């Protein structure tokens, strides 16, 4: 469990997307090629990707004292699960926990997509192209999995997204403090008429590194209340078979196909 945690308060988010911009700038990520079009959740870009690690989504939420819906806005990134599916299914051990955060070693990643299939939050994605910054450093590596690293690789004391949030919707502190804050906010929201207000991230996958204050039930935000865990017995057997295949005269493409299909089966069974 990470000693510290993010706090996302959906009731305070203004949808300014400063967090998206800060994440792009600090990590040197390229811009998405998008159209001037509001998607189903009025988002742009449409989702998290290998080059977009922070995403702001708009959801309609009903209030008990109003006849019309209002918008609630949610900041989304990797949830940094204490016991992440992505780590458990990775055949190359390219995913690990660093100071409590879930990070990917692109030098070990073979781009099989096992982590993509296993994540119920649809966070990691395989990059479709290489991208270097002005200094010539590889920021994005083609056919490798990428996602939020909680700014651990850049050794920031406060993650970039949190440092620029103007409304206090994003906080970063010791996890117990974030949980206490979240529970108090839920009490306030219920008093304001949000009868279904709740805290998300307390128990899912052993506890998440992102604690979220919701104004409605988790499913309204596409968040599973009881997300499925990977069957570790099957996962270990799959890794054993993968290890045997990797010692044989099989190329990377064949190994990638095996890992991808196996992970889809594990995700389906979960």
Model-derived features: positions:
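Non-ligating segments of multi-cofactor redox enzymes
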Residues: 1-270
